[in-house]
């Protein structure tokens, strides 16, 4: 089956928001729980929804913590977000070749749009599914299924690209092929345990993989 659709995670996959996310968590947690959290403590918080993460920390303050996080994240967004090499060129080429491309993210739409605008990727994506659009987040298949439906695409003709196990398992649950990115903060070996179909060392590897898949 040939691939005609590519779905991407956003944070840590298309744009480097790692420092923004870590700083947002540390700011929020230092505000409410001084001297209790270090950088390494917040790394596992990257991937799940803010609600899931903060519920485990203090269920009575979830909305307050989310508000604090999002305010800091918004205020410091443009200074802390960086690009990944070959991402822009790869997405541009996918569009040129006629692929359907979409984003499936556990982030709120407002900050998604900020990131896409800053990286100039906003012109390329036909569909962007955010946490605001679904009841269940990755690895539940709902966000991917919604994106595929909006793109009029079949799961067996789609590839999900991401930097977290939520992306890989989400793709598997939705019935797509999966590609993990080796630049994940979680480490290449960690993602390999979830058995993605492909591992990208840089985003442009995707073009070669798709070319090989669609030739066979």
Swiss-Prot record:
Family according to the record: Belongs to the HAD-like hydrolase superfamily. PpaX family.
Record has Flavoprotein as a keyword: no
Pfam families: HAD_2
SUPFAM superfamilies: HAD-like
Listed name of the protein: Pyrophosphatase PpaX
EC number: 3.6.1.1
Residues annotated as the enzyme's active site: 9
Key words of the record: Hydrolase, Magnesium
Domain of life assignment: Bacteria
Source taxonomy: Bacteria, Bacillati, Bacillota, Bacilli, Bacillales
Species per Swiss-Prot/TrEMBL record: Bacillus anthracis
Gene Ontology CC: cytosol
Required cofactor names: Mg(2+)
Enzyme kind, highest EC tier: hydrolase
């Amino acid at each position: 089956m040939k691939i005609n659709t590519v779905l991407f995670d956003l944070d840590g996959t298309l744009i480097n928001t790692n420092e923004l996310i870590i700083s947002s968590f540390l700011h929020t947690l230092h505000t409410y729980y001084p001297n209790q959290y270090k950088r390494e403590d917040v790394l596992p918080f990257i991937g799940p929804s803010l609600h899931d993460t903060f519920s485990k920390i203090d269920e009575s303050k979830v909305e307050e913590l989310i508000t604090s996080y999002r305010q800091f994240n918004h205020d410091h967004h443009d200074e802390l977000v960086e690009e990944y090499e070959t991402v822009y060129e790869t997405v541009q080429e996918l569009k040129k070749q006629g692929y359907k491309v979409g984003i499936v993210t556990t982030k709120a739409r407002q900050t998604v749009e900020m990131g896409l605008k800053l990286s100039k990727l906003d012109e390329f994506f036909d569909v962007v599914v955010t946490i605001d659009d679904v009841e269940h987040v990755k690895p539940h298949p709902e966000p991917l299924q919604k994106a595929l439906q909006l793109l009029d695409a079949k799961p067996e003709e789609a590839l999900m690209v991401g930097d977290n196990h939520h992306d890989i398992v989400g793709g598997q649950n939705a019935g797509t092929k999966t590609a993990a990115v080796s630049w994940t903060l979680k480490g290449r070996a960690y993602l390999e345990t979830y058995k993605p179909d492909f591992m990208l060392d840089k985003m442009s590897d995707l073009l070669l993989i798709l070319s090989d898949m669609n030739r066979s």
